[in-house]
Amino acid sequence: FLREEALQAARQSIEGVRQVSNIVLAMKEFSHPASKEMGPVDLNRVLERSAVVCKSEWKHVAEIAFELDESLPEVVGLEGALNQVALNMIVNAAHAVADKGTGMGKITVRTKREDDKVRLEISDTGTGIPAHIRDRIFEPFFTTKDVGRGTGQGLALAHDIVVNKHHGQIRVKSTEGEGTTFIITLPIDAQDRKAA
């Protein structure tokens, strides 16, 4: 009996070390992307890594589901900046679910190709965004969060990175009390970026 418990404890320790190793690797890749110049970026990997980095924000309030297009082409972009967009979106989704206060919610992360673009969606079952403020959410310093919890920079930064640095689009669909979906589209290659 003692031998079985020791084996089980060893297995759990190995699994714990593996999880810590994954978190450290994700944080290293997140904070020190390979390049600070435009280059090929795997958005599926960016989204998965960002979810690992901010797991403490969502693990007690929501389940996270990935519906990733495994054949999604890389985009030409700034990996570090796209990491920041993904992180902000997932953290905001977690906060919206937590603010709803109705138990475990859900965050869904999707990717797919649309012609010469890639589309990513981050949906949550949180509070939703009231219609009267939706047109202001990308303004710098605009926040509905309590002092100390939000600066109003996350969505403004995401908008700048997606629209100005990557010539993409960012849109929001939201229903109060039901949740929100942010939809980001990015051109796949540099030629599309220049034409945009």
Ranges and model annotations:
Residues 1-196:
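Core catalytic ATP-binding domain of two-component histidine kinases
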